[in-house]
Amino acid sequence: LAFSLVTGVGTANAATPSTAKASVTETAKASVTKEQAPPRGRTAATANPLYRTGTLPDLRCTTGQIRAGSAASYKIFMTRVNRCLNLMWKTQFRKAKLPFAQPKLRFVTSRVSSPCGRWPSGAGGYYCSSNRTMYIGVTRAVLKNPYGPNHAQFMAHEYAHHVQQLAGIMNYYGQSVWRARSSTKLAFSRRLELQADCLGSAFLRQVADDLPVDQEQWDAMVRWVDENGHKSWPTNDHGKGRSQAYWMERGFNAASPSACNTWTASSRSVA
């Protein structure tokens, strides 16, 4: 069963992110423990081991800058962000004693299909769980905006769907929507997407000094999402703007997966 999970918004050479900050190297050297299979069923979503792993590592992530109109600089930037995500989530999965594997990253200039089907309407990119690949669109519209934190947040959201796949959350989601009525399907989709917003924002907090993004810039990003985040998703499968903003704030403030359990949250907070 394959699902294409989307968010709105060639391989480039990239420098390996530095792990100079102590928390990353110390965690990486932690005692090796036997991995366990990801949980199954509702527990995978509501009580996942990732929720008990504490804050994400304080990672130095050197990305460089995006030049307006430059596809090459955009690919380099996004590839470096992806490498930082790989390192950060590998550390977190080790703490959860869960197996980890990196996703594939594919840059495309047209709306290609995948094993999950056609490119979803309104999406600037998407993650396909069937082949564990992130498809990132490189278009003129994207390249007009050189503001790195926006693109890093987008990448981190798509990567969060891969995290959900590895952690067993995606499997629970797939089984649930397969049996659900239309309105219930949308509710499940919102919980999945809003969790990805939260996890992506937790990552952004831990690399904010390097991107950089200060509190004023972050607040501006959240306000924009609050006012506009729902406009690409008329069926409300990603949540209202205020819901997206709420979960982004939770992730950024806590920098921990524990803040991102949308599966036990009230219906009002995932509307």
Walk through the language-model features, giving the residues of each.
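Post-HExxH zinc-binding segment in Zn-dependent metallohydrolases
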Residues: S182-D209
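Active-site scaffold of zinc-dependent metalloenzymes
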Residues: P115-P149, Q165
